[in-house]
């Protein structure tokens, strides 16, 4: 009996429009035009990032090595923002995270805060307002350690974080990276 009552109340609650009140809309236009679909990539156009001899450092690692003019532009940007430049260097075998070059309590990690310490060139350049002073220190460091990685990092003393870091010298003897045009196979 309850099933019959439930069935009749459901059918009463559903309103069915009369056939004559439903009209097809023949002239509907889309509100937004669909973006054209790009042709799918061919299998021979897809590249694979090679993990062998393709190690990266910091901010601009995906780019080809920076020229002197590009490094000078980055130094200008660091100084103009009031950040504190600091030079660091490391031999090739100490530049990457490994059991021999890092002090850690967990597994291997990446980025600056991984307990992988490079040797600091002098002190951070607190209060430096002259980009030429930073460039002179870069030249002095690269002359003193011609076969070492040299990176410039910038710190924000208000936020107390590293803002950026990039290589200014890669050793000529380094064989652990690929030029940008050979990073994929």
Swiss-Prot record:
GO CC terms in record: chloroplast stroma
Residue list for modification N-methylmethionine: 46
GO annotation, biological process: photorespiration; reductive pentose-phosphate cycle
SMART domains according to UniProt: RuBisCO_small
SUPFAM superfamilies noted in UniProt: RuBisCO, small subunit (SSF55239)
Any GO molecular function: ribulose-bisphosphate carboxylase activity
Its job: RuBisCO catalyzes two reactions: the carboxylation of D-ribulose 1,5-bisphosphate, the primary event in carbon dioxide fixation, as well as the oxidative fragmentation of the pentose substrate. Both reactions occur simultaneously and in competition at the same active site. Although the small subunit is not catalytic it is essential for maximal activity.
HAMAP family referenced in this protein's UniProt entry, alphabetically: RuBisCO_S_bact
Family affiliation: Belongs to the RuBisCO small chain family.
Note: The basic functional RuBisCO is composed of a large chain homodimer in a 'head-to-tail' conformation. In form I RuBisCO this homodimer is arranged in a barrel-like tetramer with the small subunits forming a tetrameric 'cap' on each end of the 'barrel'.
Family annotation (PANTHER family): RIBULOSE BISPHOSPHATE CARBOXYLASE SMALL CHAIN 1, CHLOROPLASTIC, RIBULOSE BISPHOSPHATE CARBOXYLASE SMALL SUBUNIT, CHLOROPLASTIC 1
Designated name of the protein: Ribulose bisphosphate carboxylase small subunit, chloroplastic 2
Organism of derivation: Chlamydomonas reinhardtii (Chlamydomonas smithii)
Taxonomic lineage: Eukaryota, Viridiplantae, Chlorophyta, core chlorophytes, Chlorophyceae
């Amino acid at each position: 009996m309850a099933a019959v009552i439930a069935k009749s109340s459901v059918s009463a609650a559903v309103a069915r429009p009369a056939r004559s009140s439903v009209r097809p809309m023949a002239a509907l236009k889309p509100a937004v035009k669909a973006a054209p679909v790009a042709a799918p990539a061919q299998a021979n156009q897809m590249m694979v990032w090679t993990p062998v001899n393709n190690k990266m450092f910091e901010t601009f690692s995906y780019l080809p090595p920076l020229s002197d003019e590009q490094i000078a532009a980055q130094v200008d940007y660091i100084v103009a923002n009031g950040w504190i430049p600091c030079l660091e260097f490391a031999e090739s075998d100490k530049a990457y995270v490994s059991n021999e070059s890092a002090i850690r309590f967990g597994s291997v990690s990446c980025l600056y805060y991984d307990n992988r310490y490079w040797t600091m060139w002098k002190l951070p350049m607190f209060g430096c307002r002259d980009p030429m002073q930073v460039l002179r220190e870069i030249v002095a460091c690269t002359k003193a350690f011609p076969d070492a990685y040299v990176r410039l990092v910038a710190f924000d003393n208000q936020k107390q974080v590293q803002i950026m870091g990039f290589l200014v010298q890669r050793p000529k003897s380094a064989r652990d990276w690929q030029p940008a045009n050979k990073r994929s196979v």
